[in-house]
UniProtKB/Swiss-Prot annotation:
The keyword NAD does not apply. The keyword Cytoplasm applies. One of its GO terms (molecular function) is RNA binding. This is Gem-associated protein 6. Keywords: Cytoplasm, mRNA processing, mRNA splicing, Nucleus, Phosphoprotein. It comes from Mus musculus (Mouse). Residues 68-166 form the AD domain. Its main location: nucleus. Residues 4-73 form the Sm domain.
Amino acid sequence: MSEWMKKSPLEWEDYVYKEVRVIACEKEYKGWLLTTDPVSANIVLVNFLEDGRLSVTGIMGHSVQTVETISEGDHRVREKLMHVFASGDCKGYSPEDLEEKRTSLKKWLEKNHIPVTEQGDAQRTLCVAGVLTIDPPYAPENCSSSNEIILSRIQDLIQGHLSASQ
């Protein structure tokens, strides 16, 4: 078993967002370590290309022999890496925005005679009729239910609510 595989996920975390050199099965890789899989020890490396594009490389954990840090990077690199897989339309919400969206949606559902409760430690998840949940940021794609009919209807209602409130 390689030195890399013997490390714990907490030790692997020390390499995240750093530029590293990985030796794996007689091949050498260089790049910014984005993440490691805690079960398989697989590594995801990112390289920023000159034309602005990205190169993403996955390295199987069992093939990794050594990993060494080349440079620490700065906050700009870390920011870029943190948003590598975020969709272009992904935007952050402040806690106040989320509270406002949750309250607005809950009131609207209650106004339309749909039974809704809050659940979870922070009461952030809305639960509709005990069979559907809506997580922040309370959009149609944040609904989950095993009942496809209810899921579809509630998603349509939420979409209508969002369209009307804009």
